């Protein structure tokens, strides 16, 4: 079931306005800033930092308009009643499936994003490509720039603050705090129209978007891709463990 279908929209509305949204609002009392920067109609790309799996719960609550994200196709293809319910839940919360294996991941997200934007809707994307493992902001993938140039849609930089306290990496829920969702002024890249294959332009646009996100979030920026940084941290931690158990000379 595509998120753009009538059934998907109905589930999205019910989850946001009746079942899940009111609970999130009452329990966590999220704070929204800059929502006036998100257009009332027409396509736009919401580019955000990514601290926790809980991010996708608070972003839709912050906006009156429906917002669509991409999710692993595994969530939509599992068998049985549980798989059926999971598929309906993820589709109903405004997510569309993509195959994230190999080199097809970025193209799948790009195609999904273009379809959403062509319908005149909001498409959410995390340029870092994965959650930050340490709360810092990492180098953005250039897919967000390609999407902006191919669609002609404005990019709304966004920052989510506090969700890593609510649900740190590897944990579901540890603490109830009020997260903040911020939206910055729209970024227009129409001056680069027709240059979606120029890697230098794509890098420049992506860096501009990441700088805007950093300004909103107040995070420390690291000029390294998040997966590489996470792997480096894991290697360092493992080396430290070995040093601790090694016999002293």
Give the predicted meaning of each segment.
Residues 25, 38-103:
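Catalytic core of membrane glycerolipid acyltransferases/transacylases, capturing the structured
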Residues 25-32, 105-107, 163-165:
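Short gly/ser/thr-rich secondary-structure transition/capping motifs
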Residues 2-7, 11, 107-249:
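Non-catalytic C-terminal accessory region of glycerolipid acyltransferases
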Residues 3-27, 78-94, 172-178:
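Alpha-helical membrane-targeting segments
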Residues 33-41, 227-229:
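Short secondary-structure junction/hinge motifs that connect adjacent elements
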Residues 18, 30-35, 54-56, 83, ...:
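A generic local structural motif
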């Amino acid at each position: 079931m595509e998120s753009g279908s009538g059934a998907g929209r109905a589930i999205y509305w019910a989850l946001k306005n009746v079942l899940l949204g009111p609970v999130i609002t009452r329990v966590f009392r999220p704070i929204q800033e800059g929502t006036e920067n998100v257009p009332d109609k027409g396509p736009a790309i919401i580019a955000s930092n990514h601290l926790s799996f809980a991010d996708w719960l608070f972003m839709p609550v912050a906006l009156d308009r429906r917002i669509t994200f991409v999710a692993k196709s595994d969530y939509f293809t599992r068998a049985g009643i549980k798989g059926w319910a999971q598929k309906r839940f993820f589709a109903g919360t405004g997510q569309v499936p993509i195959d994230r294996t190999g080199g097809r991941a970025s193209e799948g997200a790009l195609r999904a994003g273009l379809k959403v934007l062509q319908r005149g809707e909001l498409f959410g994307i995390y340029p870092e490509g994965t959650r930050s493992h340490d709360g810092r902001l990492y180098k953005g993938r250039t897919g967000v720039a390609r999407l902006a140039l191919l669609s002609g849609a404005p990019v709304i930089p966004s920052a989510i603050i506090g969700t890593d306290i609510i649900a740190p990496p590897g944990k579901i829920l540890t603490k109830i705090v009020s997260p903040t969702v911020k939206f910055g002024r729209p970024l227009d890249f129409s001056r680069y129209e027709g240059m979606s294959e120029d890697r230098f332009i794509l890098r420049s646009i992506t860096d501009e978007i990441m700088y805007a996100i950093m300004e909103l979030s107040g995070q420390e920026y690291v000029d390294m891709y998040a997966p590489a940084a996470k792997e480096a941290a894991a290697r360092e931690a493992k080396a430290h463990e070995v040093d601790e158990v090694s016999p002293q000379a």
